[in-house]
């Protein structure tokens, strides 16, 4: 890389301004995803496996549907929608209306009905991988739940009474039993305990043998989650990464390796200027799985389709601190 290009890269770094996360968005993300690290691994408790943020292909909508939490045991598969809503929640049939403290209303789909579509997409995905072959697999093994985590949400009786709805007070009984290992981990353990309790009382007739259950765990573990970009300043973009462009090379998402973190290391201060002037070290670098470190320049970018946007956009890597592959 030439001296001029190194200096241009450092100047572009100096011009970048930190982008901070909105406090309300940050709270919602922390409350609903619980533990960011379980998105790249999975959580086990009392023989049950819990996976978060899995996005299952839905041919009917020609898109992926996200399932917040999936709890697996040999007897039962629980598909769980997690919400941290506050205010009041009313049942209006096809929609649920949330009235927040300020009086504004938000219309949500009926989560019970919406979960049925996600269940069908999940079963279809299992069948494509040689699992869930029986016609009555869903009836014998699957349950759907909606978990409301926020104690400041008042839920209308018609919603709260539904057997597939878990309000915070119902979960609190299990939450109090968990050892103090951090709120998020206690919450996850409580969700699993609730599912195990439901399993014992529901009388499900299915029971997967060890080999088939292991195949099920692997199949769910391999389902994609969201990709994320952590920007300079802390704001996180969630969506789908399409391509990474470094120098003359373009890598599609599938070429970037398995899920995990790809730090984008920049020397933004005086040390970066020293590197640019002397050529000793790299102003910016990233390391992909199984590859040597790649030197970064001002022209390098990433093609990313953020949630809520109508089309992908190209973001300069000078704005990015970390790529999280889902």
What do the predicted segments below correspond to?
Residues 1-65, 101-326:
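Surface-exposed interaction regions that form or flank ligand-binding interfaces
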